[in-house]
Amino acid sequence: KFLSLFKSVIIKSVYCVNCGYCAAECKSGCIDMANGVHISNQCKHCFSCHDIYPHCLRYNSIKNRIGAKVMTGLDRYYSFGIKENWLRVYFDYEGTSSFWKSDGDGEVPNKKKDAFLNFVKDAGLVDEDKSLKGKEYKYIKYKPNKFAEKMFSLGVDDESMWAYLMCNLVYAEDSEEFRWFIKNIPFSETSTPESIKLRLDEVMENDKSGLGKRNICDALKSFLIKTPFGKQLGLGSVIDYEEKVSSNGRETITLNYFVRGSWKNPDEKVILYALYKFAEACGNYRQFTLTRLLDTSVESAGISPTQIFGLNRETM
């Protein structure tokens, strides 16, 4: 705990811009930021101002930059995200070319098909057949691999299947989207589309029109509401939204807020798979401790299953 607090003090000293978030978190009202930062002598040392993930809101918004480069691959699924039924149809076809040629029985036409292709690539379900060249092979050159065959055998209705996909999505080479979700959406706090956009501001500073941030929020909305990533796996254990269908069948969903929670029925095989992915990302270092896995403040290429699924010490 001391090391975490010590790190928090350094981070706050470097990145604080008096945004007022720490003052709002202080239950005793001991932090005053009206003119600089002043801590009252009545401070209870409850550390709630240090428990903000990861210690400072501004630091959290810029920590994913590398060499001052803005993160890329954050808008992989456009405004669509995916829907459970898209994957169901893909599984029914077992990922064959017939799925792509039929636009997934009409479920994924046009740009939706591009978004879904990015999803199956990021989820590790396909490998590229590089012998197939030309525009006509844009989709069908991506063939289901052995991992996909395992997922087909589990089926779309299996909660663990979606958990396996989430493990792959957070490590996707070409996409930062799920990795950003997992690292930046806080647990047990009310999040809104506006709060997500604020968190995205400094890693998408070139998004002057705001379209990219809107797309990401719309995609997140779809993941939360239209797939098991939301309530079942905990990315949105509580979701408040309104859904309307117009006379011509057009669906409109308004996300009011959501609260990230934990996966209530974790599968030990999935957790082992997540640990394998974690070790692989950490250079095959396998001598990690439970304390290390629970400490999400450590900067690392590996993402602990505790952070992916919100698992506590007892569950681990």
Please name every model-derived segment.
Residues 21-38, 44, 48-65:
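Iron-sulfur cluster-binding cysteine motifs and their immediate structural context
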Residues 107-122, 210-235, 302-316:
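Short amphipathic alpha-helical interaction segments
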Residues 90-106, 176-217, 283-306:
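Short acidic, hydrophobic short linear motifs in intrinsically disordered regions
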Residues 188-255:
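Hydrophobic, aromatic-enriched interface-forming segments
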